[in-house]
């Protein structure tokens, strides 16, 4: 699709349904080619910068493996690896990197930062995550749902449970609206998305034959779901008062077997962008348990480890979908 050539991937709202479907189909094709050994490098001799203000396992590995598979060279700049925002403006960093690299990935805090990189670098820029959005994650989520459920995207009943304001919830709602899905956002009223984003997504959903429901009623929200999705309730670095308040608000929205059963769908699947606090077996998980007495947070270990959980297939699909984004915007077809 020539109209994706040289375009940045900052938010799904920049793309039409046809374009998102193209990226998902390309993801399937590239995944199949990798599995059977027929993959052709379409990013040969391309140089890609990975600019990370926030550390990551899946996003970094997905971009690096995808780039190497496609013949590209990668430079990783971690949280202390560049002067952007410290000794150099984002605008200046964009122009420096744009002169050396063919594409730039950014994972960090501000959506405005990734937009500035795209505006001034002169090369495709890909959003690996900001506080407001996470578009590459959603491509992996949707591809996984289609693979497992064997349904067209528009026929999937997709439900997000938890903090309705966070970047993953925002991105999922955008993607579901574009793809014409039936999307439910189940969250406390205090954690609803902004009216501006909600209204925009509802309008897009209506244009594509989809539907968006926001509710704090768990029974109503999860009924008939094909996918139950959640994310962490709080982020490290947020003050203790925020943790305490958020935990109290979200305790009833923990994804557990009872919630999965309430869907009434024996084939419902569970998705999560990871990492997940489903037990106290990590350093942070142990700290949460010691401070708040909570061993399992947004999802129980029972659900996380169940047959319904597709989180590791979903994690692998980060690489295939990210590869599709890079190939579509930078590759030589």
UniProtKB/Swiss-Prot annotation:
It catalyses: carbamoyl phosphate + L-ornithine = L-citrulline + phosphate + H(+). Its EC number is 2.1.3.3. Transmembrane segments: none annotated. GO terms for cellular component: cytoplasm. One of its GO terms (molecular function) is amino acid binding. The keyword Amino-acid biosynthesis applies. It is found in: Cytoplasm. It comes from the Bacteria. Pathway: Amino-acid biosynthesis; L-arginine biosynthesis; L-arginine from L-ornithine and carbamoyl phosphate: step 1/3. It is an enzyme of class 2 (transferase). Carbamoyl phosphate binds at residues 56-59, 83, 107, 134-137, 273-274, 318. InterPro entries: Asp/Orn_carbamoyltranf_P-bd, Asp/Orn_carbamoylTrfase, Asp/Orn_carbamoylTrfase_sf, Asp_carbamoyltransf_Asp/Orn-bd, Orn/put_carbamltrans, OTCase_ArgI. GO terms for biological process: arginine biosynthetic process via ornithine; citrulline biosynthetic process; L-arginine biosynthetic process. It holds the Pfam family OTCace. Keywords: Amino-acid biosynthesis, Arginine biosynthesis, Cytoplasm, Transferase. NCBIfam families: orni_carb_tr, PRK00779.1, PRK04284.1. Belongs to the aspartate/ornithine carbamoyltransferase superfamily. OTCase family. Reversibly catalyzes the transfer of the carbamoyl group from carbamoyl phosphate (CP) to the N(epsilon) atom of ornithine (ORN) to produce L-citrulline. This is Ornithine carbamoyltransferase. It comes from Staphylococcus aureus (strain MSSA476).
